């Protein structure tokens, strides 16, 4: 009896969805490969066109080498990324399991209203819409009735919120979804640093390797947070994102 309780508690803590059989339409889909596919840099949502304020730090000589790039990444991941991206992913994932579309739309509204920089708001909407449309264009993939209802009713989707709905709709584990999303988005940031600072490719890989321990800490922290922490963002990053709007020359849209 005690053993059964322990298993139940563990499943809840890591966000393992209810054991539901695959539909015939998705019987051929391997979620292990699918989660790699949607997090791949070539998945066509346009994330490579955005730096989310990083370009301002680089032009203002705040990020100039491997050490300052790593410092920036740690600060960004533990503030803006954790309380907006990671937490909203978790909240929309859990709401999808509960079939609570109203709560998902509420989370997206909070993010939209809490994101002061215009470029970041537009970037969130573009990436979210593009993620949804790309999934819908994959005709072999049956996302289910709830995802389709979400896709029709969402007004301000973000990449993270739509990804959370996607992961839960296909019965992916929450912790696995968080892990893949965190790594993929951090890798994009590192690529931006390598191209724009610039850094060597080796320095970029050293940065990613050194972030493995912080990655695990961020995932565990995300699982502990609730909706009251949503968008507890970094004011400094918002300022840099606003300043990006008036940079003389720009490589990125945000």
UniProtKB/Swiss-Prot annotation:
GO molecular function, a single term: nickel cation binding
Positions in coiled-coil regions: none
Pfam entry (one): UreF
Disulfide-bond pairs as recorded: none
InterPro entries in the cross-refs: UreF, UreF_sf
Subcellular locations according to the entry: Cytoplasm
Gene3D superfamilies for this protein: Urease accessory protein UreF
Keyword list, A-Z: Chaperone, Cytoplasm, Nickel insertion
Leader peptide range in chain numbering: none
Recorded superkingdom: Bacteria
Main location: cytoplasm
Biased composition, class Basic and acidic residues, residue ranges: 1-11
A GO CC annotation given for this chain: cytoplasm
Region (Disordered): 1-25
Function as written in the Swiss-Prot or TrEMBL entry: Required for maturation of urease via the functional incorporation of the urease nickel metallocenter.
Family, similarity comment: Belongs to the UreF family.
Subunit structure: UreH, UreF and UreG form a complex that acts as a GTP-hydrolysis-dependent molecular chaperone, activating the urease apoprotein by helping to assemble the nickel containing metallocenter of UreC. The UreE protein probably delivers the nickel.
Identification of the protein by name: Urease accessory protein UreF
Gene this chain is encoded by: ureF
